[in-house]
């Protein structure tokens, strides 16, 4: 590569190895040079965006995806274009630019209606804002059908059902989420507690809230739930 930076085959081989080893610094080095020497190779932009995300360089991830989209051609893989829009959606959401995020997810789903990651994140963020819940449920259900053992997707679907007031059904899915991930995150554990409380199991709720606390969740709302032994709503946005 030092002699011939445009040697795509060599760069792709090295990139494959770096991706396998999750060496994000090396991925950045290879892809930053790759987008210069092969500006039409969308793979370099894609892995560079992922590496920037890992490094929490949100603005750089956003910029490289937008640059990639300017190199999209008629014969570019629609799934790859969709992934760029999904990463843009995630980046905008990180920056609290929700309208821009949702527009990007919409674009992602135009290019690939089965983009599972975009469907899940879009659905979950809508549920957190308590808006467009029917749309959120529909999108989330597709992810659960596609990957019925994925605890992240099961949690999203359970949470949407909870927000809609379908507590008994929500409990079925949150139980599956917990069952499929022995090391559940504090968010999933807190969701589980909330759902258990609303299905009349205050004791089970308290158990899961305490587990969420032990996992490092230090939110005031969770603290109050544990102290008062009851569900307290943490609405980030009123229902629309």
Where would I find each of the regions flagged by the language model?
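Residue-level recognition of tetratricopeptide repeat
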Residues: 7, 16, 41, 50, 75, 81, 90, 124-125, ...
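Position-specific recognition of the canonical hydrophobic site in helix A of tetratricopeptide repeat
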Residues: 19, 53, 86, 93, ...
